[in-house]
Structures are given as structure tokens and as C-alpha cells.
Amino acid sequence: MITMDIRKRHIVRTLRAAVLLLFVSAFLSRCASMMTPTGGPRDSLPPVIVNMTPDNFSTNRPLVNHEKIYIEFDEFVQLKDQQKEFFTSPAMKKKPLITLRGRGIVVQLRDTLAPNTTYALNFGSAIRDNNEGNPLYSMRYVFSTGPEIDSMVLSGYTADSYKADSVSKSFIWFFPADSVENVAEYDSTIFKYKPAAIARAENNGIFIAQNLKPIAYRVYAVQDKNDNQIYEPGSDQVGFLEGTYNPREQPDFAMWYDSIRQYVVAEPQLYLRMFTDKAFRRQVLSQSERPLQHQAM
């Protein structure tokens, strides 16, 4: 009898343990199905350039029959708002075609280039990593059709002339002063000529114009709301400076990178106050006469 009791107790304990094990397994399985793996910390870093073909800052590039430019990154990337973010300096009649390939982008130039000219492809924040969309700010690809790269720099600030607030994302146009010989031409410069160099202000209104020549420029700022590289009176804000400015003759300025806002900051050398005008043309006094009754006898 004692032996039978011991066996019964053992069987009961075994059954209890089995039931408890099944309950715990079901509970853990339910919990596991409700939780998802964290996958580690969120990726907050932009793509890193690992190769450019041809090399950045290359010279003596052909005027026609351009080879494709390939820019490779350390991860897969995406293009966002490239029509709005991307621009060239100077402007090209046919905008380059940008496509994705592997872990990089391909840029196909489609325009005949000018001789002995430095070109800059400015991508803004169009290039982003494929997973989190982290932008690679202010990436530039620079080359020259001549033996040298123009290397002069000017900094400036664009502000609303009425509110004194900064004007972000406005384009800065640089025209060689020797192409504008008189006041009348100066007034119509942005209608008659194409800028020799282009820069764009950051969100804080600061701009840094790079790869300029060591010559005197006339400087204009245009908001360009339609992203067509054309000034449209009554729609776009515009600003201009009366004098001419040679980057070689300007004082040095400090420049640093704001890691929080993620753009370059500089002490401005030029200040452009922008306004909206239906007819951007100054009135010029062409003749001065006194009425006959007020003339001296």
C-alpha cells in the first residue's frame, strides 16, 4: 500500500509539473509574439562618399561627348526633390540627368560646355540614405573644361527689406562687371544676361559662393519661386548691390559648420536686401530743364 501511495504521489507531481510547464510555455510564446525586435539604435548618419569617377575637381574635361559621372556611397541612397534641390553653376541649357545605380548615382551631362570654365554640380539635400532618409547636405561635384579650377569665395546674407527677416533658398547670381558697361544695362542685367556663377542661400539666409574668378562681379539675389532660373517681376523677390565686388579684394571671413542645424555658417561680406517689385527698373534722369518762366533772365 505504501508503495502504491508513493507511486500515486509521484504521478500527481509529474502531472502538475507538466501542466505548469505547458502554462509557462504558452505564456512565454504569447509574450514573444507581442514583442518585436528593436533592431538597434536608429540610423541618423548621412551617406558617405567612397568614390567619384571622374575625380572631383578634375580639369581639362571635354566640351562635348561627356563621360558619365558616377558617385558611389557606402550604402544605398535615394533621390528626393532633385528637381528643386539640384542646380548647376553656371546654369546649363539642358539640365543633367541623374539616376540611381547600385550604391551610387549617375550624372549624365547633356549640354555643350563653355571652354575654360569651372562648373559646379550642387545637390543640396537631394541625396539621402535609403533606409531613414538622412540627407547628405551641400554635396558638390566640381570640374573645369580648362587647366585650372576657379577658387575664389564670397560670403553674404539675404534679408527681406521690409521685415528684416532672412530670406532662405534664394539664388545669388554673379555677372562679370565688364559685361555691364553702363547704368541702363546694369538695370536690365538679369533680363539680358546669364549669370557666370550661381550660389544659393541656406535656411538662415547665409550664402557662400565658391569657385568664383578673381574678377569684379555685379551681384543679384533672386528668390525664384518657380525654380526656373528666371526672374519674374511681381512674383520673385529680388535684391542687388550698387557696386562691383572682386572676391580677391574682399577681407577674409570666418566660416564654420553648425552640426545641429547641419549647414555651413559664415561671416557675411555682402548684404542683399530683397523686395518684390512689378517693374524692376530704376528711373534714370535723362534730361533736366527748367520751365521757361523760371529760367534766369
Predicted regions and their residues:
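Bacterial Sec-dependent N-terminal signal peptides
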Residues: M1-P46
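Acidic carboxylate motifs that coordinate Ca2+ or other divalent cations, activating on Asp/Glu
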Residues: N228
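Extracellular interaction modules
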Residues: Q250
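Acidic, low-complexity Ser/Thr/Gly/Pro-rich repeat segments typical of extracellular/periplasmic
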Residues: R30-N211, A216-Y220, G234, V238, ...
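Long, low-complexity intrinsically disordered regulatory regions
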Residues: F253-R261, E267
